[in-house]
């Protein structure tokens, strides 16, 4: 099985037909493919592989002028590069199997230490993973997994594997650690953003940063070489380790875990691999990550994280900021956009709690060029805060309803201690879910308001958005707070009063209004 020339990548053609494509086909005939047909974390991992090969084949692009020539140069360059390095993409090569380490030893008998490859799939019921969508995997480590699925899972596992306890193996006589670090794409449950174009080839070019843009994040660090060109010989191979973990190209296809598949790809040996320094330790952010200011006074920076309870569109204003020299902003790919260019933004994320995978998500947003203007994105952000204000008010109203109806509620909340937020979350959950579902169905109103800025329609569109928020909060309150008994009616009235009360105007805003009135 050759990862470069044999088909294993799930794609969709321009006609909408699903098929498997090879790495060579994606990079040389991608104009015939519409998109990938994979899970969110798999999309990010595959795109990193495509970009790594494209950079290596082109030895660039070094600047914007070279970036513009990528469509003409990449097909031939990729074909020649993959042919030159064909042996390094052999999955079962005797001495240099792709993304594996030959000659690993478990330190046990010949049969012991080999585990099922199902552990590489976050979506499979194996180890601590949930069985919710994979009942077949319960107590069934011997099931047959197709080799193409194993390759995709192996690549994604290297990028997104969370740290924790791990089996130990021997690499060149040295035993690996029993504790592992995070893969480069999973720290802080970071959000990843990719541009999408009309076909897969255009999408790859859109996300291929020039070396000028890469230097914004990596400064004087070396661009490096792909891991298959400088594969470490052992844990003591400092030069190859540095290339793999501290350079742009080296990190795109990481070796977070060292592994070796058996002859039929059904089992594997796996241990801790190379440690990849994260953003929290001062290392540059990943090219698809979003960096925000956490503390304006201290100018503390952090990665934009995915929280399963918060829809991605509420963070959109931070994602579309063009990354600046100090590293704050969205993905590097935004720097290739012209000022008047609209774009589709794919937002993918994987949420984790320590070593447990919680959820994956993916959304696609149409971003008008005007929305990327700072003043307009600030309006979008302000209106998102307005929607969150209504959500908070809905939660307080539901609490008032419960307190009036249940005399012991306040005591339970007070005695809940550290689990207070969990208790309140359960109380708010149904109402909040209904509210946000209604709001998301009407996101077009927010986009229409933003598009109307500077025109006579700005006030009507804003009022329509605000009216929808108010009505959605009221509908959610009515749905979860019953009115069947006198006590319920009294409790409903208390909560309704808080929900419908006019919002308090901040003192600063009151002063501005007085000045305006003269």
Label the predicted regions:
Residues 1-132, 156-518:
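Extended alpha-helical scaffolding segments
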Residues 151-154:
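Short functional micro-motifs and their immediate structural scaffolds
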Residues 134-136:
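Beta-strand elements of modular eukaryotic interaction domains
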Residues 146-149:
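Short Cys/His-rich metal-coordination motifs, predominantly Zn2+-binding knuckles/fingers
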Residues 138-141:
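Flanking scaffold residues of small Cys/His-coordinated metal-binding clusters
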């Amino acid at each position: 099985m050759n990862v470069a020339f044999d088909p294993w990548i799930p794609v969709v053609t321009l006609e909408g037909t699903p098929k498997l494509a090879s790495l060579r086909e994606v990079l040389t005939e991608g104009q015939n493919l519409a998109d990938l047909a994979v899970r969110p974390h798999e999309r990010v991992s595959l795109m990193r592989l495509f970009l790594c090969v494209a950079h290596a084949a082109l030895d660039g692009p070094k600047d914007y002028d070279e970036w513009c020539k990528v469509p003409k140069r990449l097909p031939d360059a990729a074909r020649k590069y993959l042919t030159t390095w064909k042996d390094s993409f052999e999955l079962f090569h005797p001495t240099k199997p792709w993304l594996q380490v030959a000659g690993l030893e478990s330190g046990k008998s010949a049969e012991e230490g080999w585990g099922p490859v199902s552990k590489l799939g976050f979506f499979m019921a194996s180890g601590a993973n949930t069985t919710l969508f994979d009942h077949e995997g319960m107590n069934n480590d011997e099931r047959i997994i197709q080799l193409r699925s194993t390759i995709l899972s192996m690549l994604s596992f290297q990028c997104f594997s969370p740290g924790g306890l791990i089996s130990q193996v021997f690499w060149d006589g040295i035993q690996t650690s029993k504790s592992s670090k995070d893969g480069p794409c999973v720290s802080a449950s970071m959000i990843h953003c990719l541009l999408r174009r009309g076909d897969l080839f255009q999408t790859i070019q859109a996300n291929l940063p020039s070396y000028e843009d890469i230097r914004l994040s990596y400064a004087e660090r070396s661009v490096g070489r792909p891991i298959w060109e400088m594969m470490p010989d052992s844990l003591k191979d400092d030069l190859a380790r540095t290339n793999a973990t501290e350079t742009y190209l080296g990190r795109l296809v990481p070796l977070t875990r060292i592994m070796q598949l058996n002859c039929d790809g059904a089992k594997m040996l796996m241990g801790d691999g190379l440690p990849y320094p994260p953003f929290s330790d001062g290392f540059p952010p990943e090219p698809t990550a979003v960096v925000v200011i956490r503390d304006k006074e201290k100018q503390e920076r952090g990665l934009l994280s995915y929280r399963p309870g918060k829809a991605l569109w509420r963070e959109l204003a931070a994602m579309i900021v063009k990354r600046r020299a100090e590293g704050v902003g969205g993905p590097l790919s935004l720097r290739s956009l012209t000022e008047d260019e609209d774009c589709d933004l794919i937002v993918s994320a994987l949420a984790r709690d320590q070593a447990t995978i919680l959820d994956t998500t993916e959304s696609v947003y149409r971003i008008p060029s005007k929305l990327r203007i700072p003043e307009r994105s600030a309006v979008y952000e302000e209106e998102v805060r307005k929607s969150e204000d209504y959500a908070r008010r809905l939660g307080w109203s539901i609490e008032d309803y419960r307190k009036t109806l249940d005399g012991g509620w306040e005591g339970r909340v007070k005695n809940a201690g550290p689990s207070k937020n969990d208790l309140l979350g359960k109380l708010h959950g149904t109402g909040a879910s209904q509210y946000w579902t209604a709001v998301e169905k009407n996101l077009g109103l927010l986009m229409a308001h933003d598009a109307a800025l500077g025109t006579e329609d700005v006030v009507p569109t804003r009022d329509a958005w605000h009216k929808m928020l108010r009505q959605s909060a009221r509908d959610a309150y009515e749905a979860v707070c019953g009115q069947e008994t006198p006590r319920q009616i009294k409790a409903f009235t208390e909560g309704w009063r808080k929900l419908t009360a006019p919002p308090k105007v901040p003192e600063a805003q009151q002063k501005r209004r007085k000045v305006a009135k003269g």
